């Protein structure tokens, strides 16, 4: 408990919140260039080969970004769009690649949750007579 004199001299400082995706610099998305595409294994107790890419963002920062969905078309030197979002069982992966943006195709054959995976709608276009 501070004394009255300490409050007069220093005041109360509000705590600053630490962002979970600092490389985005308060932006919802950042574009970047893919440097390396690789697979990594998750923490215990999970087991898989998760696909990640090392991306150099437009602000010159390098981050590891997760590639969601089954199969992907991410290659080295592709232009990608990166959003925030951690992968719970991959330490150090705090970003996701947005599928269906720039050089990256969406997941083919996706019926549900299509917007997350950049999959197009299966609705037939109405033709005018």
Swiss-Prot record:
Q: Which family does it belong to?
A: Belongs to the universal ribosomal protein uS12 family.
Region described as Disordered: 1-25, 110-129
Q: Which SUPFAM superfamilies does this UniProt record tie to the protein?
A: Nucleic acid-binding proteins (SSF50249)
Tell me yes or no: is Disulfide bond among this UniProt entry's keywords: no
Q: Which organism is it from?
A: Rickettsia canadensis (strain McKiel)
Pfam families to which the protein is assigned, alphabetical: Ribosom_S12_S23
Example GO CC term: the record gives:
small ribosomal subunit
Q: Which GO terms describe its molecular function?
A: rRNA binding; structural constituent of ribosome; tRNA binding
Which parts of the sequence carry 3-methylthioaspartic acid?
89
| Annotated GO biological process | translation
What does the subunit section of this Swiss-Prot or TrEMBL entry state? Part of the 30S ribosomal subunit. Contacts proteins S8 and S17. May interact with IF1 in the 30S initiation complex.
Name of this protein: Small ribosomal subunit protein uS12
Keyword set, alphabetical order: Methylation, Ribonucleoprotein, Ribosomal protein, RNA-binding, rRNA-binding, tRNA-binding
Q: What is the lineage of its organism?
A: Bacteria, Pseudomonadati, Pseudomonadota, Alphaproteobacteria, Rickettsiales
Q: Where is the composition biased (Basic residues)?
A: 10-20
């Amino acid at each position: 408990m501070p004394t009255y004199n300490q409050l007069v001299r220093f005041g109360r400082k509000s705590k600053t919140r630490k962002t979970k995706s600092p490389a985005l610099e308060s932006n919802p998305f950042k574009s970047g260039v893919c440097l390396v595409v690789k697979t990594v294994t998750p923490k215990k107790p999970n087991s898989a080969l998760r696909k990640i890419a090392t991306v150099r963002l437009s602000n010159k920062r390098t981050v590891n970004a997760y590639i969601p969905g089954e199969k992907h078309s991410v290659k080295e030197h592709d232009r990608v769009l990166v959003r925030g979002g951690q992968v719970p069982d991959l330490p150090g992966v705090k970003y996701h690649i947005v599928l269906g943006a720039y050089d990256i195709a969406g997941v083919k054959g996706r019926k549900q949750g299509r917007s997350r995976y950049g999959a197009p709608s299966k609705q037939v276009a109405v033709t005018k007579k």
